[in-house]
Amino acid sequence: MEIIIFDTQQQLDAYAAELIVNTVNKKPNAVLGLATGSTPIGIYDKMIELYNQKKVSFRSVTTYNLDEYVGLQPQNDQSYAYYMNKHLFSHVDIPEDQTHLPNGMADDIDAECIRYDTMLEAQPVDIQLLGLGHNGHIGFNEPDVNLSGGTHAVKLKDETREANARFFDSMQEVPTSAVTMGVGSILKADTIVLAVRGADKAEIVKEALTGPITTSVPASLLQTHARVIVLLDREAGRMLE
């Protein structure tokens, strides 16, 4: 595991974007695993900047997102499909049919999970971008006695819904469940990039990276992966220094 601490968020964003863009430039048909939330926005902005500077093309790339809320239409401005179009896809040359998210509106969610895993098996992820939840979740893999290996539906814990409530008009509007890639699916990526910022994440960063490997801190399972690059701003990394 490689851990890099940056003085500024801008430096972190630029470094993460370069990692992803370099992967694409070395392998134009790379498979990218993408994340949502507040942390990746600056990374996607930098990727768009590099695209506009003609330093990368995404036209042969395939993407798989970690998760999607159950019950939100893709056109809903709080869906992750909407987020990805707003923050990345609509600004670069990636064809729409090469971008994939779990379908949170599927009539049969179990069948949708199988479909998504089948696609991931056929197109293994070259580089997976992750954020980190306050309780150690990655994707929507919440702390639990048993963590599902593959894509699955999950009931969201209250603390996760509260953390995401800032994006909605009220707590009542925050979905109670989601479809997420499992930890097993995430760990199949060739390279994993974990990007974390903010003093409020410092404690869970230390626990996930240096504490025991346990399903009560899902991100701690990243310690078992051969190639994880952890990118932290100074505040998130303060308990490691």
Indicate where each model-derived feature is located:
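N-terminal glycine-/serine-/threonine-rich phosphate-binding loop
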Residues: 1-32
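Glycine-rich N-terminal segment of FAD-binding domains in flavoprotein oxidoreductases
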Residues: 26-52
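A glycine-rich beta-strand to alpha-helix segment
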Residues: 30, 38-39, 43, 119-143
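Short beta-strand segments
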Residues: 33-37, 65, 102-103, 129-132, ...
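Short glycine-rich anion-binding loops that position phosphate/pyrophosphate groups of nucleotides
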Residues: 38-39, 69, 134-137, 199-200, ...
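Ligand-binding beta-strand-loop-alpha-helix segment within the catalytic cores
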Residues: 58-128
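Class I SAM-dependent methyltransferase SAM-binding "motif I" and its flanking Rossmann-like core
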Residues: 139-183
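ATP/nucleoside-binding phosphotransfer catalytic cores, i.e., glycine-rich phosphate-binding loops
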Residues: 182-184, 188-241
